[in-house]
């Protein structure tokens, strides 16, 4: 989770400088609709729906991965990796599934954009660190030992 900072009178502020609602770590008290989101190089979406989420046996996988990113200094800056839980991707048979989205408008690595990873519930902390480091260094995931969800060719549906 985005780390909230304790500043005077027990008020919390998130990394973007917004005061946080009591009981939350990043939800702003006042929504500023025109405020941009915090930069990220890579965004990883992790399926947290019934089947994939059940495979994790860890309800806090997204929060735990955010903590790992903080430990290895990839939670902010130019190489920031953002983690989000999602609903079903429709790829339950490959559980547990994650999708990598690279911010190709700025400094994302196109070769790693839209890669679907499978069986992520089997990843150790070290495996996650290997993935995060490769993404930050723009190493192709195709060249590493990360099992991917196979995609059919578009011609399959003609």
Per-segment meaning from a language model:
Residues 1-6, 49-67:
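Short, charge-rich amphipathic segments
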Residues 41-57, 82-103:
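Local cysteine-cluster metal-coordination motifs and their immediate loop/turn environment
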Residues 37-39, 76, 93, 110:
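A generic structural signal for short, non-catalytic loop/turn and secondary-structure boundary residues
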Residues 17-33, 57-76:
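Short, charged low-complexity linear segments at domain edges
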Residues 78-80:
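Feature captures the catalytic cores and cofactor-binding loops of soluble hydro-lyases/lyases
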Residues 3-37, 134-137, 141, 146:
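N-terminal leader/targeting and pre-domain segments
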Residues 94-158:
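Short flanking/linker segments adjacent to small metal-binding domains or redox-active Cys/His motifs
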């Amino acid at each position: 989770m985005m780390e909230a900072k304790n500043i005077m009178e027990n008020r919390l502020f998130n990394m973007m400088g917004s005061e946080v609602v009591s009981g939350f770590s990043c939800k702003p008290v006042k929504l500023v609709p025109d405020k941009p989101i915090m930069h990220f190089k890579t965004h990883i979406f992790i399926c947290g729906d019934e089947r994939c989420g059940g495979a994790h046996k860890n309800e806090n996988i997204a929060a735990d991965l955010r903590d790992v990113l903080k430990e290895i200094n990839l939670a902010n800056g130019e190489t920031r990796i953002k983690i989000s839980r999602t609903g079903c991707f429709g790829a339950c048979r490959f559980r547990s599934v994650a999708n990598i989205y690279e911010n190709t408008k700025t400094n994302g690595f196109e070769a790693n954009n839209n890669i679907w990873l499978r069986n992520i519930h089997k990843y150790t902390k070290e495996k996650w660190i290997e993935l995060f480091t490769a993404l930050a260094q723009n190493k192709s995931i195709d060249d590493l030992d990360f099992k991917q969800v196979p995609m059919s060719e578009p011609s399959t549906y003609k």
